């Protein structure tokens, strides 16, 4: 598969991506997709915010207005305890905070989006409108720590991987919490939020890359599991995705990897080791697109029965090499590329952008530019819902970071 692109090809893909984002605008903000299947034609917190971040990166006034409206829609439908909707119909008649479990990440993406928009626009009216909703979100997130020890606990089906089997102290959700606290502390001048973000960053660096030399560190959250992982399981090649009272899980998490880069988690050696793992995975898979999780769960594996049970619509989406079960996602790859640009890795980031653009340009029945949700990790055939706003957002965010730098309002 050809993955290099000329600047002309990058520019064409960028315009196609902007056009798709415009096509996902509604009176209520960005819908996940204009294709009305499985609730995709709704305003979703995580999809809408990521699309909105791309809007800010683009500088397009209509798209930026769409970001503001997305955040407004989410705020106006905030739940009684501070919950941010997972999704809302465009007319506001139906609001979901999650079906099988509530969505921890919806809260956190909302705060990240609110603060990015305010830092970009200096919109004082919106800042005052959003202030109370942000305070309620961060209070609720603290409640979801349960034991007041600093880490949010995510139930199964409680984040973007809603049909996967991830649960516990999930790294990607902790990183979003850190981003939310840091940016909200800056925007709303709350020293306690900034201090909590700093402490959380330190906790994450210790607890998600267990090292024998740190086994007695006071920041270790689960000493028995930590010591076992550090001493008995050998060296690891990437950030561990989650742990729970039952111990660590050790699969690769694409979103956690991307967010770890974006937030500057760890040291140079850890970043280089994790990137080496990702590049080796690319050679194995044959694509630079980042998988949601790896390795794949196969029928007969211990986790297969639980994976089969956790789905809502029709047949199981998480067949091997698809969806969250090893599927390759442009949106994760876009966040990965932005994270790489934080460290000036332009050549590698352009390689990822080419993979995103190539994936987005594919279509069925001879069509082009269908912006599919994900690709099959063996066949590289586009799969899932078409015309995904955040697949387009991936190309915009990566392109703008490569050619204009990582925006200060994001970090």
PLM feature spans:
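Inter-helical turn/loop segments and adjacent helix faces that build the functional surface
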Residues: 58, 117-129, 183-195, 265
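Extended amphipathic alpha-helical segments enriched in small hydrophobics
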Residues: 170-204, 327-363
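Alpha-helical support elements that line or immediately flank enzyme active sites
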Residues: 47-77, 120, 256-267, 333-349, ...
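Hydrophobic core segments within long, regular secondary-structure runs in both alpha-
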Residues: 11-18, 22, 52, 64-75, ...
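TPR repeat positional signature
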Residues: 48, 52, 107, 111-114, ...
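Extended glycan-interaction surfaces of carbohydrate-active proteins
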Residues: 2-43, 69-101, 143-168, 206-328, ...
């Amino acid at each position: 598969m050809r993955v290099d692109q000329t600047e002309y090809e990058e520019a064409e893909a960028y315009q196609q991506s902007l056009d798709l984002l415009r096509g996902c605008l509604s009176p209520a903000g960005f819908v996940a997709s204009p294709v009305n299947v499985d609730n995709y034609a709704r305003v979703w917190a995580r999809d809408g915010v990521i699309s909105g971040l791309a809007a800010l990166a683009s500088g397009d006034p209509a798209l930026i207005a769409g970001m503001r409206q997305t955040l407004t829609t989410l705020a106006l439908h905030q739940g009684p305890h501070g919950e941010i909707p997972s999704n809302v119909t465009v007319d506001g008649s139906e609001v979901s905070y999650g079906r099988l479990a509530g969505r921890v990440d919806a809260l956190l993406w909302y705060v990240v989006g609110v603060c990015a928009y305010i830092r970009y626009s200096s919109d004082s009216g919106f800042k005052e409108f959003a202030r109370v909703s942000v305070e309620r979100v961060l209070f609720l997130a603290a409640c979801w720590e349960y034991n007041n020890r600093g880490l949010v606990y995510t139930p199964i089906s409680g984040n973007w991987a809603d049909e996967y089997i991830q649960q516990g102290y999930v790294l990607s959700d902790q990183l979003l919490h850190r981003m939310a606290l840091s940016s909200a502390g800056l925007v709303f001048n709350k020293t306690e939020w900034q201090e909590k973000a700093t402490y959380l960053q330190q906790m994450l660096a210790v607890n998600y890359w267990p090292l024998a030399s740190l086994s007695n560190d006071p920041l270790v959250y689960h000493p028995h599991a930590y010591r076992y992982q550090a001493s008995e399981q050998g060296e690891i090649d990437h950030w561990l995705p989650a742990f729970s009272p039952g111990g660590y899980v050790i699969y690769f998490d694409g979103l956690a990897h991307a967010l770890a880069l974006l937030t500057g988690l760890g040291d140079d050696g850890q970043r280089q080791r994790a990137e080496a793992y990702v590049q080796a995975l690319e050679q194995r898979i044959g694509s630079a697109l980042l998988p949601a999780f790896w390795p794949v769960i196969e029928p007969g594996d211990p986790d297969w029965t639980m994976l089969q049970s956790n789905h809502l619509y029709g047949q199981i989406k998480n067949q091997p090499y698809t969806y969250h079960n090893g599927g390759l996602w442009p949106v994760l790859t876009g966040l990965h590329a932005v994270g790489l640009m934080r460290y000036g890795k332009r050549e590698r980031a352009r390689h990822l952008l080419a993979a995103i653009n190539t994936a987005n340009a594919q279509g069925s029945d001879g069509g082009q530019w269908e912006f599919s949700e994900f690709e099959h990790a063996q066949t590289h055939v586009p799969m899932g819902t078409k015309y995904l706003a955040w697949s387009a957002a991936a190309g915009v965010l990566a392109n703008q970071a490569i050619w204009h730098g990582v925006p200060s309002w994001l970090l």
